[in-house]
Amino acid sequence: MVDDELAELRRRRMEQMQRQAMDQQGMEEEAARQQQIDAQVRAALMEILEPEARERLNTIKLTRPEFAKAVEQQLVMLAQSGRVRQRITDEQLKALLAQLTPSKKEFRITRK
């Protein structure tokens, strides 16, 4: 009876260790896949953006990473669909950013 319990504990522990190993392997594969996607996005941006525009996008990425990610995705989609015929300049990127930036409500406080 003690041997059966010990064997059962060993079996459970072995299953747990196998699950952990598989989970870790899955996370490593996911991280590698994400790195590959990021590298492809960077390569695409290098091709479609002028250096000044790329610098502006990197500055935005430091302050608003989620917004920069959305802009990057938008630029890559435009390039993949063939709507970008030449490299995007800093001025064109500014115009795109102005379109994507949600308008802010302006509040005025008046005293009587």
Swiss-Prot record:
GO terms for molecular function: DNA binding. The keyword rRNA processing does not apply. Pfam families: dsDNA_bind. One of its GO terms (cellular component) is cytosol. The keyword DNA-binding applies. SUPFAM superfamilies: Double-stranded DNA-binding domain (SSF46950). InterPro entries: DNA_bind_arc, PDCD5-like, PDCD5-like_sf. Keywords: DNA-binding. Residues 14-35 are annotated as: Disordered. NCBIfam families: PRK04239.1. Belongs to the PDCD5 family. This is DNA-binding protein Memar_1972.
